[in-house]
Amino acid sequence: MPTVLKAAAVLDVDKGRVVPDGFVLVAGETIQSWGNRTDLPSVPPDTAVLSFPRQTLIPGLINSHAHLCVPSGGQPFYLKQSDEMALLTAVRNMRRELLSGVTTVRDCGDQNGVLFALRKAVNLAILDGPRFILCGPPLTMTGGHAHFLGGVADGPAEIARMVRRRIAEGADFIKLIGTGGGTPDTHPAHASYSRQELAAAVSAAHRLDVPVTVHCRGTPGIVNALEAGVDQIEHA
């Protein structure tokens, strides 16, 4: 059964304008039409109608760099938590994202792959949630930034194997840690993975048409990432 959403206005992001007296017509998971209510097509008499007389309807927002497993409230994210707590934290944060208008989340590093299960639960309609773009635990060197998340790999051969494993688990992209970060005993200005190690990851991922992004907060790591041919750099 279709549903009509009526609101004070609808945001037209293509033309950069606000359409007054707006509507959005939805059938299942598809937006069939939208615009000013004078353009509302004929619908069956039993069509559900939801009214938002003071609100403006906007397209779903995209959070392009999230960490749903990270606790909030001032708790340092590097304090090791169980996978069960990481998953429960992600469920809470996922709900907050959805209620704030975010309908797509690109998560840039979870703990031991718990978000793969969460995405499956959402896809099976067990839970309400956004669309997910996932990488699983980021790959990092022994003792490197975010090492506690479960993605430690050293040397080109081991890194390439880990890349293939991540993709088999369901990763949409590969994330590597190219410099230190907020983890104790790491330094944001210091490179972690070498250019050769990053290049091994890029080669393995690109062979399977999967993009690669790298956490870099210092120039040496950025240079390594660029020379290795990565697709994206986070934080630079």
Predicted region positions:
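Histidine-centered divalent metal-coordination motifs
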Residues: 7, 65-69, 215, 235
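Active-site core of metal-dependent hydrolases
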Residues: 184-236
